[in-house]
Amino acid sequence: MSKNTIEISFLHRQLAMILTSWGLTSIVMGITLLFFDVDFLRSLSIQFLIWGIVNFLLGIFPLIRNSIPNRKRLYKILLINSFLDVIYLIVSFLLIFQIVFQGESAVGHGFGVMIQGLFLLVFDTYYGIRFKRIED
C-alpha cells in the first residue's frame, strides 16, 4: 500500500467514526428530548432522531465494509454535501423566523435543522479539503 492509500484509508475511517458517533449522539438527544411536553423540544427531538439515524447509517456502513474509497469520488461527494448543507441552513432560518410555517413547532424544527446542518457543513467542508489535498 502506498502512503497516500494509507492516508486515504485512515481519513475515511476517521470520517466514518465521527459521523457514526455524531449520529448516535443525535439519536440519544432525540430520544431524551421526546420526554418533554413542549412543542419546541418535541420538534427538535424529531430532527435529532431523523438526522441521527441517517448519519449513523452513513457512518456505520463504511466501517463495516472497511474498503478504501476513491479519493476523487469522495471529495466530490463531500463538496456536493457542503453545498447541500448551506441549503439546510437556509431552510432552518426560514423555519426559525417563521417565514413559511408558524408556531413553536416550526422554530423547533428550524433549530434542529440548523444544529445538524452547521455540524455537517463544518464536517463535510473539512474532510472535503483534506481529501482534496491528498495527491493521487
What is the role of each PLM region?
Residues S2-D136:
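Polytopic alpha-helical membrane-helix bundles and their juxtamembrane interface segments
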